[in-house]
């Protein structure tokens, strides 16, 4: 089947609705929607839940942008895209909970297609989800990765290990020499064997996010925390900001190509702190995190 951008867009709009409904049901608060238009073509729906019962901030963004020509920053690496019109669409989300025992989560699914008359379209899917705990619980990481493995299984035995490794490699802070969290799945440039297969996989990843995350939220939401745990959470959130502003390709691409800044930076935690050369107390739960987030086979 030839690529069907309209079909993908309809799925993404439904996915945004579904994820927002499930997060809202878990939290008790509602999302506020901000619809926006892009002057050069397209637009989106940014939805944010703030200061809820569980989530300090949850942002779920849908965007669909199109144009007559790709920006130079994109065609420099992919000369075959020069002279083509393009469409890019996706759903991306980040959830920052109040409770430091609940991890931060991130998910993204996206589709890109570039066309010109008389030539085959160039298209691909990308996406994934990853988990960033502040306090490590083995059963949470195992559940997260088991959900990822199970949704990959129908697409081949090698899919989960390949995209898990890609996720571990991608969400790595080179300047800190540490992982951002316990990973999950990451894939990009997916266009084989055919459109239907790739679209089905992207849908499985998008639909799998709440199955992976919400049971962890339920398990941790009643745990009691205080100033010590909150301070550590805010300190570790600094790593999240560092990764997004220094290393994340999507953030950099969006900012460099005149994307909508408010939507791009919706992933940022609302509060964060840095402290010069801070070291956790030896033997403490905070000190245990650095070992917990080391790359390993969780399932």
Swiss-Prot record:
Cofactor(s) it depends on: a divalent metal cation
Oxidoreductase among keywords: yes
InterPro entries associated with the record: Coprogen_oxidase_aer, Coprogen_oxidase_aer_sf, Coprogen_oxidase_CS
EC number: 1.3.3.3
Residues carrying the site annotation Important for dimerization: 175
Family annotation (HAMAP family): Coprogen_oxidas
Protein name: Oxygen-dependent coproporphyrinogen-III oxidase
């Amino acid at each position: 089947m030839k690529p069907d951008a309209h079909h993908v867009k309809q799925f993404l709009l439904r996915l945004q609705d579904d994820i927002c409904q499930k997060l809202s049901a878990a939290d008790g608060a509602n999302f506020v929607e901000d619809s926006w238009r892009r002057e050069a073509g397209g637009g989106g729906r940014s939805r944010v839940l703030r200061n809820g019962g569980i989530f300090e901030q949850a942002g779920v963004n849908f965007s669909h942008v199109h144009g007559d020509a790709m920006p130079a920053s994109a065609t420099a690496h992919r000369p075959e895209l020069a002279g083509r019109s393009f469409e890019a669409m996706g759903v991306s989300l980040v959830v920052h909970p109040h409770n430091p025992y609940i991890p931060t989560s991130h998910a993204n699914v996206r589709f890109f297609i570039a066309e010109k008359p008389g030539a085959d379209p160039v298209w691909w899917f990308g996406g994934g989800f990853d988990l960033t705990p502040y306090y490590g619980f083995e059963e949470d990481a195992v559940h997260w990765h088991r959900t990822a493995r199970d949704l990959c299984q129908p697409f081949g035995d090698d899919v989960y290990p390949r995209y898990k490794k890609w996720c571990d490699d991608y969400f790595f802070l080179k300047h800190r020499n540490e992982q951002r969290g316990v990973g999950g799945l990451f894939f990009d440039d997916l266009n084989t064997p055919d459109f239907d297969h790739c679209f089905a996989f992207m849908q499985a990843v998008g639909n799998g996010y709440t199955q992976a995350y919400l049971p962890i939220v339920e398990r941790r939401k009643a745990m009691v925390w205080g100033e010590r745990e909150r301070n550590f959470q805010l300190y570790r959130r600094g790593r999240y900001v560092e990764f997004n502003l220094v290393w994340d390709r999507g953030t950099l691409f969006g900012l460099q190509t005149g994307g909508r800044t408010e939507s791009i930076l919706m992933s940022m935690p609302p509060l964060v702190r840095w402290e010069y050369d801070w070291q956790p107390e030896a033997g403490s739960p905070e000190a245990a995190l650095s070992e917990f987030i080391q790359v390993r086979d969780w399932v």
